[in-house]
């Protein structure tokens, strides 16, 4: 399925298992204040982004919605993602939370609604998945998926619901390339979406990354984004800097060689910079 989203900036889209599609590169607004988020989303949409990723726990859904609604871009051309907080997990509460997110965003629907964390000790992510299925059925969300789910979490919800997430958004960068989980996702027909693609900035001065960047006359950030896109991921890059937001788009005019991909793949050491989904329980 093709999409006009992102075409102005040359951002391709990938098809999801439910017939919808999503741009392969988007802006994330985690840890940004409301004012920062509103400015960043406005700058991103002006630059050509069409995928915006927020969450209830970020506290900036209203700001994202203001920027989206003020952009003058037709709603159907913008792909908006938000996420269910751990505190709102449950069959009924997840549906209420989805509608509350819509109200804060000032939108009639979201393109993608995700369970933010499995929070396994709470025992509610399976019930929450049922709630998301109902939210999709009711038109609150066009696609539904998960974040930070491992293979066991995925099999639990799929085996019990007979409904497969469209996306699994996970921390993913060369120090944590998630090869096994990407393979699991692909086996289910789930698109892998990468967050933290720059390794919270720790990879920007890594010799392997800077070497590849110099070879292509690109920035380290552009190389890291390109690496993840070439793996077949959708990538969410967070920034509050308009220049970096624009620069991050300049990843579709070059390709990494097989050797360069292998070099970056070889950096994997299982290093996480974000919480471990096996143990994290909130918020």
Swiss-Prot record:
<dbReference type="InterPro" id="IPR036812">
    <property type="entry name" value="NADP_OxRdtase_dom_sf"/>
</dbReference>
<dbReference type="InterPro" id="IPR023210">
    <property type="entry name" value="NADP_OxRdtase_dom"/>
</dbReference>
<feature type="binding site">
    <location>
        <position position="198"/>
    </location>
    <ligand>
        <name>NADPH</name>
    </ligand>
</feature>
<protein>
    <recommendedName>
        <fullName>Aldo-keto reductase Mjls_1918</fullName>
        <ecNumber>1.1.1.-</ecNumber>
    </recommendedName>
</protein>
<feature type="binding site">
    <location>
        <position position="239"/>
    </location>
    <ligand>
        <name>NADPH</name>
    </ligand>
</feature>
<feature type="binding site">
    <location>
        <position position="236"/>
    </location>
    <ligand>
        <name>NADPH</name>
    </ligand>
</feature>
<dbReference type="Pfam" id="PF00248">
    <property type="entry name" value="Aldo_ket_red"/>
</dbReference>
<feature type="active site" description="Proton donor">
    <location>
        <position position="58"/>
    </location>
</feature>
<feature type="binding site">
    <location>
        <position position="200"/>
    </location>
    <ligand>
        <name>NADPH</name>
    </ligand>
</feature>
<feature type="binding site">
    <location>
        <position position="238"/>
    </location>
    <ligand>
        <name>NADPH</name>
    </ligand>
</feature>
<feature type="binding site">
    <location>
        <position position="244"/>
    </location>
    <ligand>
        <name>NADPH</name>
    </ligand>
</feature>
<dbReference type="GO" id="GO:0004033">
    <property type="term" value="F:aldo-keto reductase (NADPH) activity"/>
</dbReference>
<feature type="binding site">
    <location>
        <position position="248"/>
    </location>
    <ligand>
        <name>NADPH</name>
    </ligand>
</feature>
<feature type="binding site">
    <location>
        <position position="240"/>
    </location>
    <ligand>
        <name>NADPH</name>
    </ligand>
</feature>
<comment type="similarity">
    <text>Belongs to the aldo/keto reductase family.</text>
</comment>
<feature type="binding site">
    <location>
        <position position="196"/>
    </location>
    <ligand>
        <name>NADPH</name>
    </ligand>
</feature>
<dbReference type="InterPro" id="IPR020471">
    <property type="entry name" value="AKR"/>
</dbReference>
<dbReference type="InterPro" id="IPR018170">
    <property type="entry name" value="Aldo/ket_reductase_CS"/>
</dbReference>
<feature type="binding site">
    <location>
        <position position="274"/>
    </location>
    <ligand>
        <name>NADPH</name>
    </ligand>
</feature>
<keyword id="KW-0521">NADP</keyword>
<feature type="binding site">
    <location>
        <position position="247"/>
    </location>
    <ligand>
        <name>NADPH</name>
    </ligand>
</feature>
<keyword id="KW-0560">Oxidoreductase</keyword>
